[in-house]
Amino acid sequence: MTVLKMTDLDLQGKRVLIREDLNVPVKDGVVSSDARILASLPTIRLALEKGAAVMVCSHLGRPTEGEFSAENSLKPVADYLSKALGRDVPLVADYLDGVDVKAGEVVLFENVRFNKGEKKNADELAQQYAALCDVFVMDAFGTAHRAEGSTHGVAKFAKVAAAGPLLAAELEALGKALGAPAQPMTAIVAGSKVSTKLDVLNSLSGICNQLIVGGGIANTFLAAAGHKVGKSLYEPDLLDTARAIAAKVSVPLPTDVVVAKEFAESAAATVKLIADVADDDMILDIGPQTAAHFAELLKSSGTILWNGPVGVFEFDQFGEGTKTLAKAIAESQAFSIAGGGDTLAAIDKYGVAQQISYISTGGGAFLEFVEGKVLPAVEVLEQRAKA
């Protein structure tokens, strides 16, 4: 994958527009989870160190296009950036006709989704973005799967279009995990439905040695293998699909599970062998025997890709399976990559972030890359690099 990289460019005195993913949760006008902002800081700092006049843009939420809405304003993000960078980061609302930014200064543009034509990737808007800068830097992996004005269109028209350090690191880590993975490779794919992760399961079944499934997905595979799953969430119409995937790759199934009579934080948890699951049981986690077996598989892997917790870890009594696997991934010598919102929450809960080789910031983009789909914002950077 050949793209121009911001790190290789001379930015002294250049106007640089950086597209970051600053779509963070805001509560009462204050940023409530700052992971994405923290991830963007090294790129912004590097551009400033290189002597650029820096303009940062992002979307936040899903406002009605073309209309300002206070709840989707990036003002809280501008306030956060000012503190984090130790300098004033003004929020600029009217920027499409040009902005006065001096070398060594940084401004944040108001939500790009307030601009008509952003979602539709309108050429006219993209050309306005491009006219603002000498160099466009795409650094938002989390929105790279969307062809929008500020992620794709601007890269077509900017004088120079490059990948930022965060985007470049994501592509390198995913390329390493999927392109030429160290063997053996184990993937964990968990979630409520096979149908939503079908392309991921199919794609990984072609490159993995072991495909560990969890959550409702595991229940569908268990039912497909003839096991009773009680009143657990599963997809009866996808049993043949599960069997077809299991015929292509080793899918180790749970031998014991943690069940409850109801889905609730107060529900009593009972460990049962899979053969003993009753008609009124709900499977909400893998059992200790299964967790220990899966942990051994992970510890002997060369590459691990983790997408999704294997149980309802939000409730502690159904979190031991995910905790055991998280600790095993942390202790493994494998190159490990993790992605997806629930996965990141589990990593935080069990304190293993430092021991995972790479944590992807992109949810949908992460999955689409794993599925083997082309990410439009990356494709346009490749095309520009060839030209």
Curated annotation (Swiss-Prot):
Protein localization: Cytoplasm
Annotated substrate binding sites: D21, L22, N23, R36, H59, L60, G61, R62, R113, R146
Record EC number: 2.7.2.3
Xref: PROSITE patterns: PGLYCERATE_KINASE (PS00111)
UniProt pathway: Carbohydrate degradation; glycolysis; pyruvate from D-glyceraldehyde 3-phosphate: step 2/5
Reactions catalysed according to its record: (2R)-3-phosphoglycerate + ATP = (2R)-3-phospho-glyceroyl phosphate + ADP
Pfam families: PGK (PF00162)
Key words, A-Z: ATP-binding, Cytoplasm, Glycolysis, Kinase, Nucleotide-binding, Transferase
UniProt family annotation: Belongs to the phosphoglycerate kinase family.
Protein name per Swiss-Prot or TrEMBL: Phosphoglycerate kinase
Biological source species: Pseudomonas syringae pv. syringae (strain B728a)
Gene: pgk
